[in-house]
C-alpha cells in the first residue's frame, strides 16, 4: 500500500501542515510521499516536517527557482501530473489541465490555486483533484482541507478529503 498526503496553498503557515501530517499518521498510518501543489512558502521547511519524499510544484506566490511549474510523478502503476494550476486557468476551466495530463501520459491530474477542494474520478479518462487549501480555504464551510490518496497492491486508487482538526 502506498499512502500519499496531498496538500496545497499553505502559504508558509506550517502549523496546519504539521497537524495534517500528525493526524494522518495517528488515524490512518505512515505516509510514504507528500505532494504539495504550490504556494508552499519555504519548501525546505516542508520537506523537513514531512520526513518523506516530497514533490513540490511552484505556485503563483512561490519564488524558489528550483521548484518546477509542473511535475510528473510515478506512484504505483500511475502517472500523476502535478501543477499549481494558475498557468492552466483552473479557476475558469479544467480542459487545459486535462490536455496537459494526457500529453504527459498521466491518468491523474492534481492542482491547487483555487483553494476549493475538487474530485472528479473517471476510470475511462483522467481523475482530476484539488485538495483545497490547508491555510486559506475558500469553499462554503471554510475548513482547512487536504487529501489522502492510497494505492493498493492491485493499483486501485482511493481518495479521501480530510479536514485539519
What are these regions (language model features)?
Residues 12, 18-19, 76, 99-105, ...:
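Binuclear metal-dependent phosphoesterase catalytic core
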Residues 2, 32, 52, 78, ...:
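A structural micro-motif
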Residues 1-51, 63-64, 68-69, 141-145, ...:
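N-terminal active-site segment of His-dependent metallophosphoesterases
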Residues 53-99, 103-104:
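Helix-adjacent hinge/juxtasegments
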Residues 11-15, 40-44, 61-67, 88-92, ...:
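Active-site environment of divalent metal-dependent phosphoester hydrolases
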Residues 6-8, 33-39, 55-60, 81-84, ...:
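Active-site neighborhood of phospho(di)ester-bond hydrolases with catalytic His/Asp-centered motifs
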Residues 52, 120-135:
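Short acidic, glycine/proline-enriched helix-loop-strand junctions
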Amino acid at each position: 500500500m502506498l499512502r500519499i498526503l496531498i496538500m496545497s496553498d499553505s502559504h508558509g503557515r506550517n502549523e496546519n501542515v504539521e497537524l495534517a501530517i500528525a493526524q494522518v499518521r495517528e488515524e490512518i498510518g505512515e505516509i510514504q510521499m507528500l505532494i504539495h501543489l504550490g504556494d508552499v512558502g519555504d519548501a525546505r521547511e516542508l520537506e523537513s516536517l514531512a520526513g518523506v519524499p516530497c514533490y513540490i510544484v511552484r505556485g503563483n506566490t512561490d519564488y524558489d527557482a528550483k521548484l518546477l511549474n509542473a511535475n510528473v510523478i510515478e506512484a504505483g502503476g500511475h502517472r500523476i501530473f502535478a501543477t499549481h494550476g494558475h498557468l492552466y486557468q483552473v479557476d475558469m476551466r479544467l480542459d487545459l489541465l486535462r490536455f496537459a495530463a494526457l500529453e504527459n501520459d498521466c491518468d491523474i491530474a492534481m492542482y491547487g490555486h483555487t483553494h476549493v477542494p475538487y474530485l472528479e474520478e473517471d476510470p475511462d479518462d483522467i481523475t482530476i483533484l484539488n485538495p483545497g487549501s490547508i491555510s486559506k480555504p475558500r469553499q462554503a464551510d471554510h475548513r482547512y482541507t487536504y487529501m489522502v490518496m492510497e494505492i493498493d497492491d492491485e493499483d486501485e486508487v482511493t481518495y479521501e478529503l480530510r479536514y485539519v482538526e
